[in-house]
């Protein structure tokens, strides 16, 4: 048994905080303008009608309505359906 810990053992022991990514409002849920719908890295979901994209690829509602997920041109898109 070694009486010393080893060369690199004290250099370990760090961990980063979770980034809390993912879908925050799901399909059919009602959102207000400015509410965050998806937090993501890269464009897993693309912005559709009444949806904006932030500098960190976060999708947010541009107007109040209900969230709708769909596919357009082979891409997953998020739309906000405004009640008539």
Swiss-Prot record:
Span list, region Disordered: 1-21
Key words of the record: Ribonucleoprotein, Ribosomal protein
GO CC terms, sorted: cytosolic large ribosomal subunit
GO aspect biological process, one term: translation
Pfam families: Ribosomal_L27 (PF01016)
One MF annotation (Gene Ontology) recorded for this entry: structural constituent of ribosome
Highest rank taxon of the organism: Bacteria
Keyword Ribonucleoprotein carried by entry: yes
UniProt cross-references to Gene3D superfamilies, sorted A to Z: 2.40.50.100
Compositionally biased residues, Polar residues: 7-19
Entry's family note: Belongs to the bacterial ribosomal protein bL27 family.
Protein name: Large ribosomal subunit protein bL27
């Amino acid at each position: 048994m070694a009486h010393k810990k080893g060369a690199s053992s004290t250099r370990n022991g760090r961990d980063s905080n979770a980034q809390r990514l993912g879908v925050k409002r799901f399909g059919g849920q009602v959102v207000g303008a400015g509410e965050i719908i998806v937090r993501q890295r890269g464009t897993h979901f693309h912005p559709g009608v009444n949806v904006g994209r932030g500098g960190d690829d976060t999708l947010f509602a541009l107007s109040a309505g209900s969230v709708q997920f769909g596919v357009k041109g082979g891409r997953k898109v998020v739309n906000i359906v405004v009640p008539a």
